[in-house]
């Protein structure tokens, strides 16, 4: 896999870890910074809930990861209603 460590800011990666057919989905959540990576498990619900384990990342980075996870969770019910898969396999975002 290519190097996901950015030269500036942070990359946030959610990778689905299991089936994607229910009202919840498990993800492996990782924050990549220029010199570190922080990983935790996450359970997202199509009611907009997002439960993340501790990442060990600075609070600001962890809070951004939680916000991204909640956005993905909130979109799940809408995607299902539109006839699309509710839980993406992989989501990658970069923030400064």
Give residue ranges: language-model regions:
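Actinobacteria-biased recognition of intrinsically disordered, low-complexity terminal regions
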Residues: 1-15, 21, 92-96
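Acidic, low-complexity intrinsically disordered segments
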Residues: 49-96
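Extended Gly/Ser/Thr-rich low-complexity repeat segments
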Residues: 37-50
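Residue-level signal for the start and early helices of compact helical domains
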Residues: 3-5, 33-35, 85
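Amphipathic, interaction-prone secondary-structure segments
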Residues: 10-39
């Amino acid at each position: 896999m290519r190097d996901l460590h950015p030269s500036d800011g942070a990359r946030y990666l959610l990778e689905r870890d299991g089936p994607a057919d229910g009202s919840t989905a498990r993800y492996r959540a990782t924050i990549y910074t220029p010199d570190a990576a922080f990983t935790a498990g996450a359970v997202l619900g199509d009611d907009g809930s997002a439960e993340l384990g501790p990442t060990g990342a600075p609070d600001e980075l962890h809070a951004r990861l939680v916000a991204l996870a909640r956005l993905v969770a909130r979109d799940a019910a809408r995607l299902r209603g539109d006839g699309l898969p509710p839980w993406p396999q992989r989501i990658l975002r970069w923030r400064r």
